[in-house]
């Protein structure tokens, strides 16, 4: 992708993320294009529809989590930190995950791949340090992500959703810690 095209795509993603957070997922796409300083045609050249735009934002957020996780690989509790950050991401992007729920399985592969990559090294570091269970696998990251994301889809008050998210995280951390492992 040419540099100018990549910059326009990044502006679209940033404008969309801000607009969705501020105004919800129903914000008109032409307003996102205007905020990014591009035309509608540029928006649709990059993203065929709203779901594709939302998916791209979600992938970008998980890739950012991966970068931040790799920067902490010297911390033996990095996998526990990763789960905490993943739970926060799931709560912060509840609307995004709802919007992509109906996508085809293949469309979600970039999210699954980014999540696996983000957590794999952290899992290995924390396992080597004896901080998390030795029998955890990279595939368990997907199970944990589904569990941690469930409260964001609950039809409850925002306060209850936050409480459910915190409790889900506590349970997940307790499940993955090595037997007799210290609380982070």
Q: Language-model features: where?
A:
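All-alpha amphipathic helical-bundle segments outside canonical DNA-binding/catalytic cores
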Residues: 110-111, 128-143, 159-163
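C-terminal peripheral helix-coil segments that are non-catalytic and often amphipathic
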Residues: 116-129, 154-184
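Helix-turn-helix/winged-helix DNA-binding modules
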Residues: 24-25, 45, 133
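Alpha-helical DNA-contacting segments of helix-turn-helix folds
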Residues: 47, 54-61
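Short secondary-structure transition hinges
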Residues: 88-121, 150-155
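Hydrophobic alpha-helical connector segments
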Residues: 56, 63-92, 104-107
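Basic, helix-initiating cap at the start of DNA-binding domains
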Residues: 1-35, 52
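Short hydrophobic/aromatic patch on the recognition helix
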Residues: 37-47
């Amino acid at each position: 992708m040419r540099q100018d095209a990549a910059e326009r795509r990044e502006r679209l993603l940033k404008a969309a993320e801000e607009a969705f957070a501020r105004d919800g997922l129903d914000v008109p796409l032409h307003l996102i294009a205007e905020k990014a300083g591009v035309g509608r045609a540029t928006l649709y050249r990059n993203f065929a529809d709203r779901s594709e735009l939302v998916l791209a934002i979600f992938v970008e957020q998980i890739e950012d989590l991966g970068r931040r996780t790799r920067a902490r690989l010297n911390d033996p509790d990095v996998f526990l930190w990763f789960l905490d950050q993943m739970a926060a991401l799931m709560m912060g992007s509840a609307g995004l995950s709802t919007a992509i729920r109906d996508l085809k399985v293949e469309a979600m592969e970039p999210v699954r791949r980014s999540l696996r990559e983000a957590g794999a090294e952290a899992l290995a570091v924390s396992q080597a340090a004896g901080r998390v269970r030795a029998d955890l696998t990279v595939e368990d990251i997907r199970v944990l992500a589904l569990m941690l994301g469930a409260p964001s889809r609950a039809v409850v008050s925002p306060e209850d959703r936050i409480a459910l998210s915190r409790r889900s995280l506590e349970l997940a951390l307790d499940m993955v810690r090595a037997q007799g492992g210290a609380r982070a």
